[in-house]
C-alpha cells in the first residue's frame, strides 16, 4: 500500500498541474482574443477614415504579434514542464512495482483446458457488460461454442439496466411483475422499490399528476405488509404537492442516489434469480489477483533467496495464507477438531446423529466395525447415519 501511496502522490501532482495549466491556457487565450479583437476594430475604423494605417497603429500591430508569440512560447514551455511531471509518474511506477510477475505464474494455467476456461470466463464477462459483438468475436477466435440460451439472459438484463441508467422504469417493472413469485420467494424488494421510484417520478410533476399518483398507489397493495412505513411516507408526501416536494419534509424522496441503488438491486436480484453471481467471475479473479500478487512476489523472492524452491510445489496450495478480505468469502470454512485440518470438497464436514461435526476423513478413521463413538459425547451410532452439511 505504501507503493500505491507514493505513485498516487506523484499522480496528484500531475493532475494539479494539468488543472492549473488548463486554467492558464483558457485565461491567456481569452485575453489575446479580446486584445486582438480591440485592435481589429481600431484598424477597421482607421481604414474607413483615410485608408492607411498610422505609424502608431503599425507599432501596436507589431506589439500584438510579439505578444501572441510570447504567449505561445510561454504555454509551450509550461507544457514541457508537465511532460517531465508525467515521466516522474512512470519512474515512480517502475521503482515501486515489479514489472515482471511471471515468476509467480503456474505453467498449468497455459494448458489447453485452462485457456478454454479462461476464454469462457471472458466471454461471460463481455456478455454481462453488454459487449455482445466482442464476445461473439472472441468465441470465433477461441473456437468456442456458446449456446444462444446462455446469451439471451444477459441481453435482456443489459437492455433493462441501460433503461434504468436513463431513468426509464417500464422495462424493469415489466420484468419484475413477470417474475414476481420467484422474487418474493427470495424476499426481494425489487418490485416495490421500482413502483416507489415510479410513484416519486409522478410526484415530481406536481399537482398535474396528483390523480394519476393516487391511482398508481394501488400497486403498493401487495407490499403493504412488509413496507407499510414506506408506503405511509409516500402517501403523506401527497399533501405537499402544491408547494413542491423539494420544499417539503419529504425532500429526501428526491435523492438521486436511489437510481444508482436500484441498478445495484436489480443486478443482484436478477443474477440471483438466474443462478449467476452478482459480480463477473473475471472481475472477482482479477481483484483477488491484485490483492494477492504483492504477497506472492515477496514470498517467491524469499524462497529463491533461501534456495528452498521445494516449498512451492503444491498444485492447489500456496506456501502462505493470503487474506483477500471478507468480500471474497464465498463459503464458510470449517476446521475438523479431530484432524485439525480445514475441510474440502473431497473431505467435507459431516454431522453426526448427536449433532457434533467432524470431517469425513476423521469419520472414516474413527469407524470401528459397525459402530462409531462420538469423540465428544458417549453416543454410539452407525457411520451411515452421518450426513454431509453445507454452511
UniProtKB/Swiss-Prot annotation:
MF terms in GO: ubiquitin protein ligase activity; ubiquitin-protein transferase activity; zinc ion binding
Disruption phenotype: Morpholino knockdown of the protein disrupts normal development of the mesencephalon, the prosencephalon and the eyes.
Native source species: Xenopus laevis
Protein name (record): E3 ubiquitin-protein ligase RMND5A
Keyword line: Cytoplasm, Metal-binding, Nucleus, Transferase, Ubl conjugation pathway, Zinc, Zinc-finger
InterPro entries, per database record: CRA_dom, CTLH/CRA, CTLH_C, Fyv10_fam, LisH, RMD5A_dRING, ZF_RING_GID, Znf-RING_euk
Compartment(s): Nucleus, Nucleoplasm; Cytoplasm
Keyword Metal-binding: yes
The keyword tRNA processing belongs to this UniProt entry's keyword annotation: no
Zinc finger (RING-Gid-type): 336-377
Domain named LisH: residues: 114-146
Domain called CTLH: residue spans: 153-210
Pfam families recorded: CTLH, zf-RING_UBOX
Amino acid at each position: 500500500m505504501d507503493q500505491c501511496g507514493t505513485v498516487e502522490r506523484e499522480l496528484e501532482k500531475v493532475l494539479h498541474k494539468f488543472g492549473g495549466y488548463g486554467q492558464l491556457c483558457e485565461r491567456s487565450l481569452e485575453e489575446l482574443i479580446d486584445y486582438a479583437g480591440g485592435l481589429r476594430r481600431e484598424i477597421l475604423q482607421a481604414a474607413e477614415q483615410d485608408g492607411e494605417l498610422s505609424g502608431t497603429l503599425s507599432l501596436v500591430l507589431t506589439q500584438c504579434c510579439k505578444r501572441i508569440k510570447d504567449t505561445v512560447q510561454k504555454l509551450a514551455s509550461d507544457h514541457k514542464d508537465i511532460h517531465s511531471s508525467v515521466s516522474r509518474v512512470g519512474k515512480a511506477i517502475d521503482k515501486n512495482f515489479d514489472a515482471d510477475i511471471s515468476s509467480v505464474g503456474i505453467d498449468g494455467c497455459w494448458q489447453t483446458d485452462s485457456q478454454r476456461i479462461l476464454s469462457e470466463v471472458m466471454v461471460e464477462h463481455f456478455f454481462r457488460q453488454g459487449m455482445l459483438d466482442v464476445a461473439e468475436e472472441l468465441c470465433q477466435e477461441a473456437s468456442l461454442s456458446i449456446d444462444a440460451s446462455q446469451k439471451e439472459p444477459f441481453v435482456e438484463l443489459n437492455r433493462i439496466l441501460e433503461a434504468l441508467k436513463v431513468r426509464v422504469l417500464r422495462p424493469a417493472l415489466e420484468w419484475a411483475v413477470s417474475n414476481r413469485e420467484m422474487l418474493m420467494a427470495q424476499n426481494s424488494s425489487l418490485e416495490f422499490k421500482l413502483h416507489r421510484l415510479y410513484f416519486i417520478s409522478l410526484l415530481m410533476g406536481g399537482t398535474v399528476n396528483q390523480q394519476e399518483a393516487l391511482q398508481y398507489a394501488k400497486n403498493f397493495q401487495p407490499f403493504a405488509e412488509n413496507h407499510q412505513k414506506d408506503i405511509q411516507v409516500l402517501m403523506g408526501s401527497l399533501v405537499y404537492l402544491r408547494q413542491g416536494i423539494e420544499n417539503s419534509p419529504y425532500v429526501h424522496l428526491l435523492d438521486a442516489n436511489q437510481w444508482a441503488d436500484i441498478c445495484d438491486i436489480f443486478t443482484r436480484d436478477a443474477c440471483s434469480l438466474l443462478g449467476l453471481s452478482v459480480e463477473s467471475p473475471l472481475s472477482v479473479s482479477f481483484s483477488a489477483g491484485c490483492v494477492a500478487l504483492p504477497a506472492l512476489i515477496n514470498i517467491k523472492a524469499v524462497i529463491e533467496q533461501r534456495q528452498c524452491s521445494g516449498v512451492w510445489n503444491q498444485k492447489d496450495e500456496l506456501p502462505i495464507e493470503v487474506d483477500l478480505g471478507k468480500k471474497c468469502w464465498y463459503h464458510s470454512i470449517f476446521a475438523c477438531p479431530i484432524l485439525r485440518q480445514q475441510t474440502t470438497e473431497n473431505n467435507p464436514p459431516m454431522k453426526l446423529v448427536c449433532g457434533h461435526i467432524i470431517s469425513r476423513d476423521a469419520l472414516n478413521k474413527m469407524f470401528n466395525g459397525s459402530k462409531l463413538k462420538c469423540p465428544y459425547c458417549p453416543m454410539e451410532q452407525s457411520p451411515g447415519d452421518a450426513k454431509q452439511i453445507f454452511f
